UniProtKB/Swiss-Prot annotation:
Its EC number is 2.1.3.2. It comes from the Bacteria. Transmembrane segments: none annotated. Keywords: Pyrimidine biosynthesis, Transferase. It comes from Clostridium acetobutylicum (strain ATCC 824 / DSM 792 / JCM 1419 / IAM 19013 / LMG 5710 / NBRC 13948 / NRRL B-527 / VKM B-1787 / 2291 / W). This is Aspartate carbamoyltransferase catalytic subunit.
Amino acid sequence: MLKGRSLIDPMDFTVDELEEIFKLADDIIACPKEYMHAAEGKILATLFYEPSTRTRFSFETAMLRLGGQVVGFSEPNSSSVSKGETIADTIRVVSCYADIAAMRHPKEGAPKVASMYSSIPVINAGDGGHQHPTQTLTDLLTMRRTKKRLSNLTIGMCGDLKFGRTVHSLIKAMSRYDNNKIVLISPDELKVPEYIKKEILDKNNIEYKEAKRIEDVIEELDVLYMTRVQKERFFNEEDYIRLKDSYILNENKLKTAKKDMIILHPLPRVNEISYEVDNDERAYYFKQAKNGMYVRMALMAKLMGVL
């Protein structure tokens, strides 16, 4: 039963509960008009303490396509937060007005705190470099629909694996499915944190290896998950400038890749995927973004108990 629950971490739901969400998303994709009144009278509050275009638009569009409405803020300066209001007080007040809330915050753990004081479901829309569970649902749905499975996959994760919350969440999620292999492709400065290796990969006996060049491992991959080097996570601009062009995927590097490999990216991209790749049949990142709207529709409908 998902009604009334929050989603803070991709591990909050069982594999069976995730499948329930994915099946509803499949149904919505097949016939979206059947669900256009599902959330009539319901209100989503978007509490975005950090800039976002795609995630916020995806949540808002998802709620509107369910027939609901949206209130909220897209930067803290436009809310009582700028006056010093705590997260606990903000969510208590928001709970009086809305039926569900989506929160993005630069501090790790902020959505978790909000969920502890909230009387409505809270969805973590990204907290610092920590977790991004709805992007993970998007990634899983896309793999499930294209590869027809979430097990027995070799997944390459490339770019910023240190600060990339989407990568951390996806590694967590994929560790729950059988016989997956993870290939971590990054420069030394942006390697996946040790706690991810110890607490998730090693603890769950997930096979993984590290590489420094895409071309050395691309022929093994069923999925290539590209990420951008995130300027906002760097304290030193010189380090950002030095590392931002570390990995650029182009058609030449795809020559040895499997014909049915899929390329994913949480977006926005900067220059890590050449525009020439957009026309490759393996490029799925824009379809992936659309899947994000559908999976958020399914998730919110389940948490509100309207479907």
